[in-house]
UniProtKB/Swiss-Prot annotation:
Descriptive protein name: Adenylyltransferase and sulfurtransferase MOCS3
Gene behind the chain: MOCS3
Organism: Homo sapiens (Human)
Active site residues per record: C239, C412
One of the GO BP terms on file: protein urmylation
Location (main, coarse): cytoplasm
Annotated effect of mutating A257T: Found in a patient with molybdenum cofactor deficiency; uncertain significance
């Protein structure tokens, strides 16, 4: 059995090694940061890539396994070497897409992403690493791709794609890949591709499912042909809200890379006019035919009305971001900050905290004093859940003055579902299915609690 002195010595050595490791990590981050910023950001590449007459000896060796494919051959590889591909979004889809395009020898990759690397990205965004957390995704991706294939020109764009810049940028590239995660950007990229005459390889992934198609190519429909009007903003779920398995984005990103390579090499796409659906849980792929190009399409029809790029956030009624949306369903009087709720909790005042997140999120983390009833149970007026809520209210009421209402505070992850729950509880109280209630939601939810109240509380 080790003596106390040996334990202390080992603890001291571990602390010293951890300090050395942290120092090495800082040096690595500095080195990677220096590598990824060799040039200032340019709005557009300065010149087209020159044509290539032949492959070098090194290129023949590097691409030998795909060169011997009769469908590709030397001619196809030469076309790849002069192709310029614009990738909108360097996240779960854009990372594997860019990785395989660089490996295949595509001449230039434009990398558009205004966001920075976060730890929550690393489970699926495989070009980024821990050492570059907080750095621009476009620069991080460019640095990784240069290490993979130094012959590929990588052009990072760290500003968000906007109606003022999109068309000029798209015109400088041969093929565009939409790897975004929001509806306004999808319409923006589609309209820019139609106006510039560029094919658009589009994919999306959510939870265990994904889909891919090619728009505006070889007489096929554009995005507006299929979706003339955007969906209601409150019906749209992104990866931050609904979650996604990293492997699913990897599969769809690889399929995007395949379509881009076939277009760039002159082989033609598989999914122009069709949509490939992927169900990861069942392991199924299914292809469905899309409607043909609409002659009355606002973008690509015979008499288009979209002749310039417009305000897509206003058109869609939502922000051009993949971040979680912040709903505003309640008045300020019906909401409290996490700081005010913490003050109430510390005072010992009688109240009930209702957590309306799904069970899978409660399994990740929770406040121990909260009653858990998922929002879906409230939406369908689940009898058992309402009984549980009534019992909890009654128990809390025993400590108050007779007849006093027990205030209910509703919390969720971000403060969106909690507002919906407040509305439901108010309607139940108005319909006398519950006793008269004072209900408020906690602004920002548990993520605000983690950021402002308890730094040890898990964020997800």
């Amino acid at each position: 059995m080790a003596s106390r002195e040996e334990v202390l010595a080992l603890q001291a050595e571990v602390a010293q090694r951890e300090e050395e490791l942290n120092s090495l990590k800082q040096k690595l981050a500095s080195a990677l940061l220096a590598e990824q910023e060799p040039q200032p950001e340019r709005l557009v590449p300065v010149s087209p890539l020159p044509p290539k007459a032949a492959l070098s000896r090194d290129e023949i060796l590097r691409y030998s396994r795909q060169l011997v494919l009769p469908e590709l051959g030397v001619h196809g590889q030469l076309r790849l070497g002069t192709a310029c591909v614009l990738i909108v979004g360097c996240g779960g889809l854009g990372c594997p897409l860019a990785q395989y395009l660089a490996a295949a020898g595509v001449g230039r990759l434009g990398l558009v992403d205004y966001d920075v690397v976060e730890m929550s990205n690393l489970a699926r965004q495989v070009l980024h690493g821990e050492a570059l957390a907080g750095q621009a995704k476009a620069f991080s991706a460019a640095a990784s791709l240069r290490r993979l294939n130094s012959a590929v020109e990588c052009v990072p764009y760290t500003q968000a794609l906007t109606p003022a810049t999109a068309l000029d940028l798209v015109r400088r590239y041969d093929v565009v890949a939409d790897c975004s995660d929001n509806v306004p950007t999808r319409y923006l990229v589609n309209d820019a591709c139609v106006l510039a005459g560029r094919p658009l390889v589009s994919a999306s992934a959510l939870r265990f499912e994904g889909q891919i198609t090619v728009y505006h190519y070889d007489g096929g429909p554009c995005y507006r042909c299929i979706f003339p009007q955007p969906p209601p903003a409150e019906t749209v779920t992104n990866c931050a809200d609904g979650g996604v398995l990293g492997v699913v984005t990897g599969v769809l990103g690889c399929l995007q890379a395949l379509e881009v390579l076939k277009i760039a090499a002159g082989l033609g796409p598989s999914y122009s006019g069709s949509l490939l659906l992927f169900d990861a849980l069942r392991g199924h792929f299914r292809s469905i035919r899309l409607r043909s190009r609409r002659l009355d399409c606002a973008a690509c029809g015979e008499r288009p009305t979209v002749t310039d790029l417009l305000d897509y956030e206003a058109f869609c009624g939502s922000s051009a971001t993949d971040k979680c949306r912040s709903l505003q369903l309640l008045s300020p009087e019906e909401r409290v900050s996490v700081t005010d709720y913490k003050r109430l909790l510390d005072s010992g005042a009688f109240h009930l905290l209702l957590d309306v997140r799904p069970q899978v999120e409660v399994d990740i983390c929770r406040l121990p004093h909260a009653l858990h009833i998922p929002l879906k149970h409230l939406e369908r007026r689940d009898a058992e859940s309402l009984k549980l809520l009534k019992e909890a209210i009654w128990e809390e009421k025993q400590g108050t003055q007779e007849g006093a209402a027990v205030p209910i505070y509703v919390i969720c992850k971000l403060g969106n579902d909690s507002q919906k729950a407040v509305k439901i509880l108010q309607s139940l109280s108005a319909a006398q299915e519950l006793d008269p209630l004072t209900v408020r939601d906690v602004v920002g939810g548990l993520m605000a609690w983690a950021a402002k109240i308890d730094g040890t509380f898990p964020q997800y």
